[in-house]
């Protein structure tokens, strides 16, 4: 169990362990209705390429069960549902009710409903039976989790033997000279876009800070392996601005 008195980071701030979950919930409740538009603006649409690359490497097949954790507005779920077909199932899970509603409404509007289920749940204590999913994806959600080790343990528990974990997340730029440019953009431009488009500068300031506080590629690889996943490797995308970690449960 998590120490009730322990502190953790919320962006660059130190907060009580249990307070972070509440604060993150407030951020995503605030950004939910503008989430897709902001993603397009902030990444110049490149996030769609990162997600499609993730799906290409998933090798998900018809009839399989997939968990899209922190699935938010449903980008990965949409693509995964096409892969598993009517005989499979994708569970879109998110801790935030506002984000879950955005994803559900969006996918229903697109006529996608036969093989998608929606669950509100905490990544640290997933409400699924052991060995439930052939593949677990988590796109841009892990950095917002309070106890990442506990969440990864929970993912390992619900992953089937022979199954795969895929974590797509902002990471640490590896190209020389890219990091200062990226930092300048993140802290000077990104919050201003949030203020102009969504009238919410503070939430996007947090998002920039949360990226900087997230473990780098090698640290996250070690964390994933520590809970039992094997053969963990990662792909740096856009010079390491984003990394896709892939690991297996044997």
From Swiss-Prot:
SUPFAM superfamilies: S-adenosyl-L-methionine-dependent methyltransferases (SSF53335)
GO biological process per UniProt: aerobic respiration; menaquinone biosynthetic process; methylation
UniProt-listed Pfam families: Ubie_methyltran (PF01209)
Disulfide bonds: none
Binding, S-adenosyl-L-methionine: 73, 94, 122-123
EC number(s) recorded for this UniProt protein: 2.1.1.163, 2.1.1.201
Record's catalysed reaction(s): a 2-demethylmenaquinol + S-adenosyl-L-methionine = a menaquinol + S-adenosyl-L-homocysteine + H(+); a 2-methoxy-6-(all-trans-polyprenyl)benzene-1,4-diol + S-adenosyl-L-methionine = a 5-methoxy-2-methyl-3-(all-trans-polyprenyl)benzene-1,4-diol + S-adenosyl-L-homocysteine + H(+)
Top EC category: transferase
PROSITE patterns per record: SAM_MT_UBIE, UBIE_1, UBIE_2
A molecular function GO annotation: 2-methoxy-6-polyprenyl-1,4-benzoquinol methyltransferase activity
InterPro entries: SAM-dependent_MTases_sf, UbiE/COQ5_MeTrFase, UbiE/COQ5_MeTrFase_CS
Gene3D superfamilies, per database record: Vaccinia Virus protein VP39
Keywords: Menaquinone biosynthesis, Methyltransferase, S-adenosyl-L-methionine, Transferase, Ubiquinone biosynthesis
Coiled-coil residue windows: none
Functional pathway: Quinol/quinone metabolism; menaquinone biosynthesis; menaquinol from 1,4-dihydroxy-2-naphthoate: step 2/2; Cofactor biosynthesis; ubiquinone biosynthesis
Similarity field: Belongs to the class I-like SAM-binding methyltransferase superfamily. MenG/UbiE family.
Main function: Methyltransferase required for the conversion of demethylmenaquinol (DMKH2) to menaquinol (MKH2) and the conversion of 2-polyprenyl-6-methoxy-1,4-benzoquinol (DDMQH2) to 2-polyprenyl-3-methyl-6-methoxy-1,4-benzoquinol (DMQH2).
Protein name (record): Ubiquinone/menaquinone biosynthesis C-methyltransferase UbiE
Organism for this UniProt entry: Legionella pneumophila (strain Paris)
